[in-house]
Design a protein with these regions (language model features):
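N-terminal cap/lid segment of alpha/beta-hydrolase-fold proteins
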Residues: 1-30
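Short amphipathic alpha-helix adjacent to the substrate-entry channel of hydrolases
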Residues: 49-70
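Helix-loop module immediately N-terminal to the HCX5R catalytic loop
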Residues: 84-88
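Primarily recognizes the serine-hydrolase "nucleophile elbow" in alpha/beta-hydrolase
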Residues: 89-101, 105-130
Length: 130
């Protein structure tokens, strides 16, 4: 497994995006998915590295997917909708760079746990609306 760090622009903010990729893909490129996994923490705590340690590694190892974990702006730094806008910017970047990252841009899964699950739901609605 390889880990990369990228930075994404989001409404004047620079957010970190951790990307984990398998050493070798278990499936053909057109079948390989990308997963945007959003960390929890009550919108006020937590970091992308939390995902790296737990869920992201498991997803990469078990399913051979590429996982991106955005370090969205926490609520004590800037209120809603900063976090969901950061996740949206991360999603756009992730899709635009799918070829470089080794997955099919038409096969993106968005998920999260706790507050990340709430951001996931808000992000899906935002993406549909835009």
């Amino acid at each position: 497994m390889k880990t990369y760090k990228y930075y994404v622009n989001s409404n004047g903010r620079r957010i970190k995006l951790l990307v984990l990729r398998p050493d070798r893909h278990a499936r053909a490129f057109d079948l390989t998915a990308g997963v945007l996994w959003i960390h929890g923490g009550g919108f006020a705590t937590g970091m992308a590295e939390m995902v790296y340690i737990t869920r992201a590694r498991a997803l990469v190892e078990k399913f051979g997917v590429t996982v991106a974990a955005p370090a969205y702006t926490l609520s004590w730094r800037e209120p809603y909708p900063a976090a969901v806008e950061d996740c949206y910017s991360a999603l756009l970047w992730f899709k635009a760079n799918a070829w470089m990252l080794g997955f099919n841009a038409d096969k993106i899964i968005v998920g999260g746990e706790s507050a990340g699950g709430g951001l996931c739901a808000a992000l899906c609605i935002l993406a549909r609306e835009r």
